[in-house]
Amino acid sequence: HVDHGKTTLTAAITTVLAKKYGGSARAFDQIDNAPEEKARGITINTSHVEYDTSLRHYAHVDCPGHADYIKNMITGAAQMDGAILVVAATDGPMPQTREHILLGRQVGVPYIVVFLNKCDMVDDEELLELVEMEVRDLLTQYDFPGDKTPIIRGSALKALEGDCIWESKIIDLANILDTYIPEPKRSIDQPFLLPIEDVFSISGRGTVVTGRVERGIIKVGEEVEIVGIKPTSKTICTGVEMFRKLLDEGRAGENVGVLLRGTKRDDIERGQVLSKPGTITPHIKFESEVYVLSKEEGGRHTPFFKGYRPQFYFRTTDVTGYVELPEGIEMVMPGDNVKMVVTLIHPIAMSDGLRFAIREGGRTV
């Protein structure tokens, strides 16, 4: 919530941890005057800081404004591994607190740790316990484990001022992050997936698809599935090439050509994916959380209504889709965020948390 102390906490974490583990402290005003980012045309004020504990290196995002938070959570390219929910002990949970938790659930934030801030200003132990209970209830309402969620009582401002009692609470918070939020699975360890960008046939060799390996590893001789747009089919990878060199495998992050056995050039198209069999499925209908660009951000100048039929851009391709809005919502204004159900005209390989863009006549909506 605005003024509950997110930015002060961010400054306190960098300052206290820099003192203990090395690294650079960031002052409040350096974080608060976050530069505007123009990520994919969306204007978001965000501040990126990094800090170290004895076990890990963290990348941490702080947004000054509520609207910035929403935009960042919905459109942020990187999936968050966890979040720190800051609640002022003096106010307790506010309407925006609920919205942040709900959004965390919808965009797939897997773990939340709570920092109960401004505890130096509350003398009443019972009041602190009441606020904790309220926060736990809210988390439980949105399917987070409210009873098990760690809650650290602290004072970001006092910690920033160097008061050692409150500094120790920041160290506690860091230890909780280290232990409560599990090590994320690196993309190389996840099942193989390659969004197809191009397809061509090489006479005498067969069909080659090219693209950047999104995750996992593909080895020569392995079976793969071709998923999306058309019925799912299976084939064997008979070769991997990079920069015209033949390789034994292609790894996450590499741009490769994959040679496929007995597959015709016309059987495959851009927009499909190559994947480890059984790991991703094609879907026509999905629920989504969408941020609609404002006019100033280059978005629409007018609202849209249910039945709107724009293009949905997934990975490498546009697909036309039909929009249904939640009950009681007649129209969506530029600058709004909304939950919508979309039905595509043909299936696309998707999994929970997949990002996409909505476009109309070549411009992003």
Curated annotation (Swiss-Prot):
Enzyme Commission number: 3.6.5.3
Domain of life: Bacteria
EC category name: hydrolase
PROSITE patterns: G_TR_1, G_TR_2
Keyword Metal-binding belongs to the record: yes
GO CC annotations on file: cytosol
Chain sites annotated for binding GTP: 1-7, 62-66, 117-120
Reaction equation(s) it catalyzes: GTP + H2O = GDP + phosphate + H(+)
Domain tr-type G: 1-185
Molecular-function GO terms, alphabetical: GTP binding; GTPase activity; translation elongation factor activity
Subcellular location: Cytoplasm
Keyword Lipid metabolism found: no
Pfam families assigned: GTP_EFTU (PF00009), GTP_EFTU_D2 (PF03144), GTP_EFTU_D3 (PF03143)
Binding residues for Mg(2+): T7
Entry keywords, A to Z: Cytoplasm, Elongation factor, GTP-binding, Hydrolase, Magnesium, Metal-binding, Nucleotide-binding, Protein biosynthesis
Function summary: GTP hydrolase that promotes the GTP-dependent binding of aminoacyl-tRNA to the A-site of ribosomes during protein biosynthesis.
UniProt similarity note: Belongs to the TRAFAC class translation factor GTPase superfamily. Classic translation factor GTPase family. EF-Tu/EF-1A subfamily.
Assembly: Monomer.
UniProt protein name: Elongation factor Tu
Naturally occurring in which organism (per UniProt): Buchnera aphidicola subsp. Melaphis rhois
